[in-house]
Amino acid sequence: KICHIPKHIKFDLIFLDGFSPQKCPEIWTEEFLSKIKQSLNHRGYLITYSSSAAVRKTLIDLGLTIYKIKPKIETSANWSNGTIAILNPYFDEYKKNSFLKELSIMELEHLETKASIPYRDPSFDCTSREILKKRKDEQLESNLLPTEVWRKKWHMTKAPFNS
């Protein structure tokens, strides 16, 4: 369990990739990602294949700077190969790495939709089903833009990933 990692142990790099947030929400909760952040060195990196708006928004809200991992060929269906989150990056650090790119306007707008509502498990004891239900309930009550409206605007009939 992440809660058992001693606070003095810090990592330069954490690769977090179990399953998508819809399959394994426990490792994508606001609380779990906060513990990940606390385990990073001063300029530590978190790398994941996830492009989920909920994950990206949570990382930003936790104070990490995020970039997308560029696919070889960008299309409307393949616009990101994942996310890199950096704690205290050097100014314009992404420009030195050909695999990193700032989020596009489309991706930034995605972070303003109901898809960006985080997964939550304050006590670290909820089941996947409970986490997903809490999030769905919060999405239903939210005044954020429905994700379907965002998808239509960007000509996406289906989500390229589970958000």
Report each predicted region and the residues it spans.
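A short SAM/SAH-binding and catalytic strip from SAM-dependent methyltransferases
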Residues: 12-27
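Conserved beta-strand signature within the Rossmann-like core of class I S-adenosyl-L-methionine
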Residues: 13-15, 42-50
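Short "lid" loop at the C-terminus of a central beta-strand within the Rossmann-like core
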Residues: 20-22, 52-55
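A short glycine-rich, Lys/Arg-flanked "PGG" loop and its adjoining helix->strand segment in the class I
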Residues: 26-43
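Residues at alpha-helix caps and immediate loop-helix transition turns in enzyme cores, especially N-
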Residues: 28-32, 51, 81
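Conserved Class I S-adenosyl-L-methionine
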Residues: 56-81
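SAM/dcSAM-binding transferase cores
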Residues: 83-163
